[in-house]
Amino acid sequence: MKHRAKEEEEENRLVQILGGYRIAMNDRRTRSTVSVVALKRIFGCILVLVFFVGFSFSNLPLTGNFRQRLISSWQTQGLKSISGNSSAVSVRETVLFPDQAFIFLKYPQGAPLFTKNDIDCVYFSPNSPQPHLDLQPDSIDSEDHDLQIVRCPLQTRGVTVSIGIKSNGHLLPIGPTFRWDSLAYEALIDYDNTTIVFVKGLNLPPKRVMDPSQFECVYGRDFTASNLLLLARVISIGQEIVRCKTPLSILSGSQSVNSSIKVSVRGVDKPVISSVARPYRRLDHNPPSQKQHQMCVCTMLRNQARILREWVMYHAHIGVQSWFVYDNNSSDDLSSLIELLDDENFNITRHAWPWIKTQEAGFAHCALRAKDSCEWVGFIDVDEFLYFPSGLPLHDVIGNLTSNVAEVRVWCHNFGPSGLKRVPTKGVLLGYTCRMDAPERHKSIVRPEALNSTLINSVHHFHLRSGFEFVNMERNALVINHYKYQVWEVFKEKFYRRSTTYSSDWQDNENLESKDRTPGLGTEAVEPPDWSTRFCEVVDTGLRDQVVEMLSDPKTQMLPWQK
């Protein structure tokens, strides 16, 4: 009891320290207001001179996609909210990826969000306080009403990026900037009040549970101020997934207070990894005893809108009841399609997942979100379709399993271009009918509440809790048709970036013998002359015939996703 009381006292002291820090910062801002007003008058005069001097150099040419803009047109000052209130839109943080900068904008409550045409990405050279280039954002994304992700192209290393508002020329102050290769990027609080933290840069081996005593979790607002940090025990750690004991002050704090607290991890005697992860309680304290859905599906995708409608409608017909779509930086208006499907009463949700090469972490995150409503969850891609050759319904197949079975492993049949050179107009199910003879690695359908607490997975399989086991499904009962090698126009997109943590990108000259790579292809997206006839050993029209019989309109012969 004494130890518990001491723990609570230390945590309460942290809350007081953090609160005092906030008050001190507010006082400091108040004291600086007078001097800022005086400086603004001087700065205004200087700005006029800079404008005329700068104008004489404004005709210097810029190459590439960069659009020229007078330096003096961007006013480096805080932006008042769009609605005219005193609250400010701000850059909460920026994360630098290899080819893009992701700028997270924080909005006042109720303020309308910017569109892509409202803003520019504005670039600063190293050691220069003045912007020199601007570009239109690659895309803008939002899931919450008060947070927006602006994706800015990053063609030069070493630059810093902010956001310029076209309507008034205001430039948002640059927020904290972090490198993607070492970052705690996501966190949530589980049913048992532990915090799950997803961390890039630990560089741990795949599929292995590590010694948690060699790490510790760190909570705080500012990880550079060691006296304002709270340490917590690591319960488990493996891959990019860390489970932490959550401090009582975090559990008892309000959501508004906790929104400014971040969590990260450090190895013993090592610095704290930078963080943008805030431990939100996204899961219900009291999940229902009766699951709402027997069968759900999780998927992670990028620019797959063209196939999503077919994938959802087919799986709805065979018994899938809910879809969790993790959008990994799509630019093909996927969100609009998901809204349309939702309006058509498909229980589908989109979750913005901007983090690259984190599919294992994303699936673990999805398993946590799905376990309160789904008895079973399948982890498959949108070019993978569950197929029941015997005609036995999905709910009978999984409903007849014993209670100690927590994972169903399903073989995959890989289909090739099937002689096609253009995208099939009636969809993949009718278009691709020729496949490889030998089946390939499994994909899994799991009971999410039976997963090991480490949440370690290899995309295809999860580690299970003690007492549970997996079964291999017979291929005559259930198999996955994987339309893996489609026409070249579609297939070449796989060269952009692989989504798994431990797979090399196909443009990299490493791990060339990996099963993730395509036989006979190098590191460049160059179409082989015989591509359309490759990977064709067995003509298989089983699923196509089922689909035509079950789903085609008797009058028009059209399929639901063609209407």
Where in this protein do the model-derived segments appear?
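Short beta-strand/loop segment that forms part of the nucleotide-sugar
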Residues: 321-329, 351-352
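Beta-strand/beta-sandwich contexts
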Residues: 45-117, 176-209
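Extended low-complexity, serine/threonine- and proline-enriched intrinsically disordered segments
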Residues: 110-131, 211-224
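Short, acidic, metal-binding catalytic loop of nucleotide-sugar glycosyltransferases
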Residues: 313-322
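Catalytic-site signature of metal-activated, phosphate-bearing donor transferases
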Residues: 2-70, 79, 143-147, 151, ...
